[in-house]
Amino acid sequence: MVTPPPDVPSTSTRSMARDLQENPNRQPGEPRVSEPYHNSIVERIRHIFRTAVSSNRCRTEYQNIDLDCAYITDRIIAIGYPATGIEANFRNSKVQTQQFLTRRHGKGNVKVFNLRGGYYYDADNFDGNVICFDMTDHHPPSLELMAPFCREAKEWLEADDKHVIAVHCKAGKGRTGVMICALLIYINFYPSPRQILDYYSIIRTKNNKGVTIPSQRRYIYYYHKLRERELNYLPLRMQLIGVYVERPPKTWGGGSKIKVEVGNGSTILFKPDPLIISKSNHQRERATWLNNCDTPNEFDTGEQKYHGFVSKRAYCFMVPEDAPVFVEGDVRIDIREIGFLKKFSDGKIGHVWFNTMFACDGGLNGGHFEYVDKTQPYIGDDTSIGRKNGMRRNETPMRKIDPETGNEFESPWQIVNPPGLEKHITEEQAMENYTNYGMIPPRYTISKILHEKHEKGIVKDDYNDRKLPMGDKSYTESGKSGDIRGVGGPFEIPYKAEEHVLTFPVYEMDRALKSKDLNNGMKLHVVLRCVDTRDSKMMEKSEVFGNLAFHNESTRRLQALTQMNPKWRPEPCAFGSKGAEMHYPPSVRYSSNDGKYNGACSENLVSDFFEHRNIAVLNRYCRYFYKQRSTSRSRYPRKFRYCPLIKKHFYIPADTDDVDENGQPFFHSPEHYIKEQEKIDAEKAAKGIENTGPSTSGSSAPGTIKKTEASQSDKVKPATEDELPPARLPDNVRRFPVVGVDFENPEEESCEHKTVESIAGFEPLEHLFHESYHPNTAGNMLRQDYHTDSEVKIAEQEAKAFVDQLLNGQGVLQEFMKQFKVPSDNSFADYVTGQAEVFKAQIALLEQSEDFQRVQANAEEVDLEHTLGEAFERFGHVVEESNGSSKNPKALKTREQMVKETGKDTQKTRNHVLLHLEANHRVQIERRETCPELHPEDKIPRIAHFSENSFSDSNFDQAIYL
């Protein structure tokens, strides 16, 4: 054992923590510990090395302790790894880190998040408040770890206003920045994820180089999209078709010699032959390049269909049709150079990480992902958070308070104040936590840093600076057309409707972004396809690939476990564990009372959302299921998903709802699931409906909404009023007056005009099924029947399909009359046909109106506000007309009949009918008053007005229509 130098304290961090006592006679405004930290001569020498290693990362000094550390907010700290041994000579020492946190925040007020996978230390060094996340360096963060990190951090911060968190990885910049940015997204610190990234980068580093790796930024944007869609992460399985490279780089020898590797996690799945272009051919290739881009904002799904080509000139690396490759979850694509002496280095030109869940809109329940750096460039002289020409609407400037003098300072820049800052911590609480102990609240230092760096001009849009200007075409000559196979080119790559194309320009490629030798027009196209679950052979092959990647990853993790100090090895999971708790070795470990990591997550987090989901107990998938609050709005994707390109359903084979006699998950053969899906599609085909959306329990009739039983994991536990966030109203939805329940004050009921977020009384809209509504409102009342976004979508799509067919005259009238048991009476048929003609005339008048351009610019608004609105108005008229006819006795069901058949009271249905009739009635009156030429009274019969008091059993029974 080496004896430390005499001037280095030989005491442990834990003993120093016990010796560190707050001054019992401290007065307000005085520090907790009156004596500053004593630095030995050796520590002063070490400080020179530490400062050099930290380089451009910001440092913080307090009572003679100078650390690689930055306050991102008053309560969130990014800090370097608390090292021991040799590493402590050039990184933060564990002793100084513990002293720093205790002196500034007191004992028991700091929770440390360790993101350096495989590195553990005694949790008692930090009051037993440590959580470890297994994150690999130089890899994108695991999406499944972002949500549990944010939940644990928020639980800790909400427990006490004095609580803070300290987050570190190795350097305290990359992985630390990703997770802190995810947390800021989680608490709605700024509305845009790019604002959050810029904010973090400016504060954490001196040169605005915080989270710079494009793949890390992409995964932050992934997490923002998950939050936006209110989804938990669950990977999607896809087939890899090929990889295309535009403008291959010049390599050693003057030509271009590159190879491509595709990996799933750490497993290489596709390694084709290299592409070799001679020097002369590469010179001819470069001569065809124009300094233009022929697609706006590079390339996305809409532009694929518009132009009809993935690329006009690209080199291909195609997967052989007889040897398909399948990927799931995190995928890495490397582009490497081959040539002289490259065997002594990796020869990497660039690489890309992406996740398959975001490759198909079906993986996001209809959402669409785009790289935010591309869609939100800086405008004019402004940055994402800096304004030089005044604040924009709904923005407030950050206060310009000099942290040293307390006076206001001058700056030509205005910084957007984070909208979520005051909810995160109020200014009064910040003053109490810091000023009361003789410290300056970090928010004032942060404001000064943000203004100064904007003044220095170091806040730049590096990503969009490498975009090519718009032009008519990108190449003087297109590639050759024909059969595209193997490796070669250049080819003109046609776009195929069933293929998903992910395009990564040079500014979205890791390492390539920093290379000035690469052409700004270089792109990497990755072509994927959703797995057709009707092809049993394909399904079996895809299972092999998925199991292989999981096996290799598990082997790697277990090998790392054998090299770990036995003191830190995790204990086996408890019997009966579900979800991530049964994943071994665990990816998240919580400190326990013995200073080790055998603890549990916060007691406020529960497993209700996957308690009855069998996929959560499988070794391959359990790692994605973490506990969350019972009031959380995030849900896991359902078993069946829908691909909008191939217009087919696909499913997670492991996500079965069946169990054997022992209660264990039971999995059928692929043929069983294929038949199950074919049955769904056959039922839809029999009804004449296009297969337009996800379904979980068969199909409904045209224009009707079928109630479905939701699984236990999808049921919503109503939140208390204190936990409810503000209700959101999409921009394309108008507010209609309605009589009855006040959606904003659910306890009040009156006959005054209230506002309901609905469209002509048609309730299956996402915002009506948002848990932000009070459980007593009609929104949550309807949620009892439509539990998930997918069920909402299929209801909307079926109704819209019915309307489209009615307007197009495709013989749906007979199907409509048959489904609703309407007698084939000529007068009734004439009436419905006449209503369709009236609606067509209304559309013609609409096109001539002044607002037509505005309406046409928003197709979604046309569909929702006019098509569905008018259709359901007509549907209401048909109900009233047929109710008055004695020729239709089978069209009605009495309340007694419904109770007898279902065994349930019809109060819920009464409320549904009440909401429909009231909304339809009010909308008709509103439209008739505002636009009488479109709604003549003689052509639109008035629907009887119902109120809750006058809604008797008799007229209620008349309103129930099959």
UniProtKB/Swiss-Prot annotation:
Disruption phenotype: Mutants are viable but with a shorter lifespan. They also fail to enter dauer stage under starvation conditions and 17 percent of mutants display vulval bursting. Unlike in wild-type animals, germline stem cell proliferation continues following sperm depletion and Z2/Z3 germline precursors continue to proliferate during L1 diapause. The number of unfertilized eggs laid after sperm depletion is also increased. Prevents constitutive dauer entry and pharynx remodeling and restores normal brood size in a daf-2 mutant background.
Catalytic site positions: 169 (phosphocysteine intermediate)
Expression (tissue specificity): Expressed in embryo, larvae and in adult germline (at protein level). Expressed at equal levels in the 6 vulva precursor cells (VPCs) of L2 larvae and in the descendant cells of the induced VPCs (at protein level). Expressed in the uterus (at protein level). Expressed in the Z2/Z3 germline precursors, oocytes, several amphid neurons and weakly in the nerve cord (at protein level).
Topology term for the membrane: Peripheral membrane protein
Top-level taxonomic group: Eukaryota
EC number: 3.1.3.16, 3.1.3.48, 3.1.3.67
Reaction equations catalysed: a 1,2-diacyl-sn-glycero-3-phospho-(1D-myo-inositol-3,4,5-trisphosphate) + H2O = a 1,2-diacyl-sn-glycero-3-phospho-(1D-myo-inositol-4,5-bisphosphate) + phosphate; O-phospho-L-seryl-[protein] + H2O = L-seryl-[protein] + phosphate; O-phospho-L-threonyl-[protein] + H2O = L-threonyl-[protein] + phosphate; O-phospho-L-tyrosyl-[protein] + H2O = L-tyrosyl-[protein] + phosphate
Modified how: Phosphorylated by vab-1 on tyrosine residues which may promote daf-18 degradation.
GO cellular component, one term: protein phosphatase inhibitor complex
Keywords: Cell membrane, Cell projection, Cytoplasm, Hydrolase, Lipid metabolism, Lipid-binding, Membrane, Nucleus, Phosphoprotein, Protein phosphatase
Domain Phosphatase tensin-type, residue spans: 58-230
Top EC group: hydrolase
Gene Ontology biological process terms from the UniProt entry: cell motility; chemosensory behavior; chemotaxis; dauer larval development; determination of adult lifespan; learning or memory; phosphatidylinositol 3-kinase/protein kinase B signal transduction; phosphatidylinositol dephosphorylation
Domain C2 tensin-type: 234-530
Function: Acts as a dual-specificity protein phosphatase, dephosphorylating tyrosine-, serine- and threonine-phosphorylated proteins. Also acts as a lipid phosphatase, removing the phosphate in the D3 position of the inositol ring from phosphatidylinositol 3,4,5-trisphosphate. By dephosphorylating PtdIns(3,4,5)P3 antagonizes PtdIns(3,4,5)P3 production by age-1/PI3K and thus, negatively regulates daf-2-mediated processes including dauer formation, longevity, fat metabolism, chemotaxis towards salt, thermotolerance and axon guidance.
Subunit relationships: Interacts (via C-terminus) with vab-1 (via kinase domain); the interaction is independent of vab-1 kinase activity. Interacts with arr-1 and mpz-1; the interaction may inhibit daf-18. Interacts (via C-terminus) with daf-2 (via kinase domain).
Protein name in UniProt: Phosphatidylinositol 3,4,5-trisphosphate 3-phosphatase and dual-specificity protein phosphatase daf-18
